[in-house]
Amino acid sequence: MNKRLYVDFHILQTVPPSCINRDDTGSPKTAVYGGVTRARVSSQAWKHAMRAAFAENAQLDVGKRTKKAAELVKAQILALAPELDADKLAKKALENAGIKSDDKGTKALFFMSTAQAKALAELAVEGSADKKQYRDALKVAPSMDMALFGRMVADDPSLNYDAAAQVAHSISTHAVQNEYDYFTAVDDCQAEDNAGASHLGTVEYNSSTLYRYATVNVMELAGQLGAAQAAETVRAFGEAFLFSMPTGKQNTFANRTLPDAVYVTLREDQPVNLCGAFERAVPRSAQGYAAPSKAALAQYAQQMYSSFAEAPAQSFTVGSGLEVLAPAQTAKAMLDALEKAVRDALAGNEVG
């Protein structure tokens, strides 16, 4: 049995002038890589966008990360026994589980699946006082996003879930320099003899071709969700990673784009981030940045496979420019093939 199975996602995506992820001063986030400044989008920002995409799919079991965990349990209690004092029972259920809560909510954000909230509610309605049962109810039945992104509970590490997915900070394949947009706002009801602006301001932005990378530990995921749901979850993760985008300043820039090229691999050794393809920044040229970035990614991947890393067990590409790595498919065909490949691999490993 091969206990290692990873799905790596590599995406090249061009975004126009935008500020989709900004720092505490309002500037687009950046990073120095290869000695030059790059545009950067944090992994947290893209994971939040992915979780929002999950929530839009009614077929997916998505959890809630909130300080109002008592409200989740309360809703389940009301569904089971509306005549009971749901507020009191929900707070007591969390207390029995070791999760501190008051009228303002839990002390920290708590990640809970619908199944876990329902299990706590059932124990509360039954009148159980066994604290171990309440704690155990939070240790099983994670939602798919909890299994992917993990859960950390500082007060009770036994409730932690290891994340099966890792998402890298996206960086531009080339050097960038932030720019400023000077804007004004005019008062629509202002007198005609006072034509000046009522508000002046600036917004900082940049544009870039981003290299985006994420990996999913399939065996870890299957251990938490089971083989069938793990395969479905890998597909959902891939779809969300391909098509989601953080929403920062989206009304100002309308910057929602789709990937230029996608490369997905099924690996049986370890995850391999191919960001090294862009350690030397792609130079400015008449071709733009997307085309030479594709060439650099393909060349670097082949170099890695001929020297350090084994070639992937299976590879898939979407879009043009990476056909040397695998035949190009549509996004839907690739996701279908990926789900089947993961399902078959888990079946071969006899993971239930």
Question: Where in this protein do the model-derived segments appear?
Answer:
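Basic polyanion-binding and macromolecular-assembly surfaces
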Residues: M1-R40, W46-G352
